[in-house]
């Protein structure tokens, strides 16, 4: 096979990681295959030595950050200086994932699976970095490909040896600080922390289409915690203090404001706080508990799920009872199940965005009470708060004033900046507004 020819001719290559060249790994881990455009893709494991890597031994808990930084430095050479061209597929459109930048590590979702990133085949150990190189060659002759691989490896070896170790140490410390703060949330009575100067806005590309792995937007308005919310300051493990907004345990925290002000973007950044980020991502110190659930509208086939926290009766066509539902769930039933399951599982933080929600489950109306027998989240907060258990809620609202009024604390976004929302004043204004509406409906002045 072609890959065997390449490997046989690479026997003199000192960087080839032959320990992985087993029969069981052939055509799975390492291979050579023709691409749709006629080019040849060769994937092989290599190992490069740098004695300076030994200085990272003190920072093993952040070693994945140092590894990813090495990979990103190689990518920047590719992008800015047009070096290591086989690793870029000579910039062919279908090969963008090979050199697309990435500023996220330790993401628990299989996002960007085709991006070059730290994993069990790309890592630093001792004085060596192990890299799985995905190379594209226009040539079809195995000897010519081997010649180019040897040149690439020699070039990479020289480049890796010149990467400043302080850059890698700083990145390892950065990851350790994020893990340290996430571990400290419980002790601080928090489920989330948003540091001042964080930059939540994301720039999406053909390859990075999900907010968890997208890079920072070029124009990015930093987050600043309003002083009225009493920002907290936290000292990190490695010589740095961060100040910002802490979301408390069992808190109902509201993010509101007009459309297109960054509410959903901020909520997505909070969700991304479960991951660790490289220096420059902008979300390094948006730190969130990993015990998190998102509730949104949708549909599913139910087979005994419990939604009795919200539903007193079931709509026609749905079998069972609110405690054991059978049939195709509506959007509100599905969302009710998500929230109730999260509470039952003692999930520490539940995220809700009005734009992706069944509104009748968040705030009840007269008709929903008549026809659906739904007890909304707003009613539960007012009357049965204890049924929400120990879960905190961060809820993005725009038009759901009643739910906003029931929050413990709130911010509104204006010009993409966080402003303090005085909920005491807001409740008074909302009460007057409701009285005014009621007076108009029944034609009688209702006194405050």
Curated annotation (Swiss-Prot):
Domain of life according to the entry: Archaea
Keyword Cell membrane carried by entry: no
MF (Gene Ontology): ATP binding
Residues involved in ATP binding: 257-264
Keyword DNA-binding assigned: no
Pfam family, one: ABC_ATPase
Keywords from the named record: ATP-binding, Nucleotide-binding
Name of the featured protein: Uncharacterized protein MJ1628
Organism name: Methanocaldococcus jannaschii (strain ATCC 43067 / DSM 2661 / JAL-1 / JCM 10045 / NBRC 100440)
Source species taxonomy: Archaea, Methanobacteriati, Methanobacteriota, Methanomada group, Methanococci
């Amino acid at each position: 096979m072609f890959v065997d020819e390449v490997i046989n001719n690479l026997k003199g290559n000192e960087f080839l990681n032959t320990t992985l060249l087993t029969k069981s790994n052939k055509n799975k881990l390492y291979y050579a295959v023709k691409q749709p455009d006629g080019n040849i893709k060769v994937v092989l494991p290599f190992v490069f030595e740098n004695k300076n890597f030994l200085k990272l031994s003190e920072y093993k808990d952040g070693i994945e950050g140092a590894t990813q930084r090495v990979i990103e430095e190689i990518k920047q050479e590719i992008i800015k200086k047009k070096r290591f061209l086989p690793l870029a597929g000579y910039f062919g459109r279908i090969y963008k994932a090979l050199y697309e930048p990435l500023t996220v590590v330790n993401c628990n979702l299989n996002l960007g699976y085709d991006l070059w990133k730290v994993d069990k085949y790309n890592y630093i150990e001792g004085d060596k970095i192990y890299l799985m190189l995905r190379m594209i060659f226009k040539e079809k002759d195995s000897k010519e490909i081997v010649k180019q691989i040897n040149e690439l490896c020699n070039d990479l070896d020289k480049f890796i040896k010149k990467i400043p170790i302080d850059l890698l140490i700083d990145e390892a410390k950065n990851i350790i600080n994020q893990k340290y703060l996430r571990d400290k949330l419980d002790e601080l009575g928090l489920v989330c922390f948003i540091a001042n100067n964080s930059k939540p806005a994301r720039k999406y590309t053909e390859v990075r289409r999900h907010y968890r792995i997208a890079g920072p937007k070029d124009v990015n308005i930093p987050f600043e915690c309003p002083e009225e919310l009493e920002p907290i300051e936290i000292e990190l493990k490695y010589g740095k203090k961060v100040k910002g907004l802490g979301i408390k345990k069992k808190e109902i925290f509201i993010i509101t404001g007009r459309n297109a002000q960054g509410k959903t973007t901020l909520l997505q950044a909070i969700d991304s706080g479960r991951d660790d980020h490289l220096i420059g991502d902008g979300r390094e110190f948006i730190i969130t508990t990993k015990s998190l659930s998102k509730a949104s509208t949708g549909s599913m086939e139910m087979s005994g799920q419990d939604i009795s926290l919200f539903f007193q009766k079931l709509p026609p066509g749905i079998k069972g009872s609110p405690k054991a539902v059978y049939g195709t769930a509506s959007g509100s039933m599905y969302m009710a199940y998500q929230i109730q399951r999260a509470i039952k599982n003692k999930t520490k933080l539940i995220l809700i965005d009005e734009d992706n929600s069944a509104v009748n489950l968040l705030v009840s109306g007269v008709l929903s009470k008549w026809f659906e027998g739904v007890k909304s989240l707003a009613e539960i907060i007012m009357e049965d708060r204890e049924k929400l258990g120990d879960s905190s809620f961060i809820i993005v609202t725009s038009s759901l004033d009643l739910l906003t009024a029931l929050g413990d604390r709130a911010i509104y976004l204006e010009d993409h900046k966080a402003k303090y929302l005085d909920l005491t004043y807001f409740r008074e204004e909302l009460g007057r507004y409701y009285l005014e509406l009621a007076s108009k409906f029944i034609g009688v002045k209702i006194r405050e």
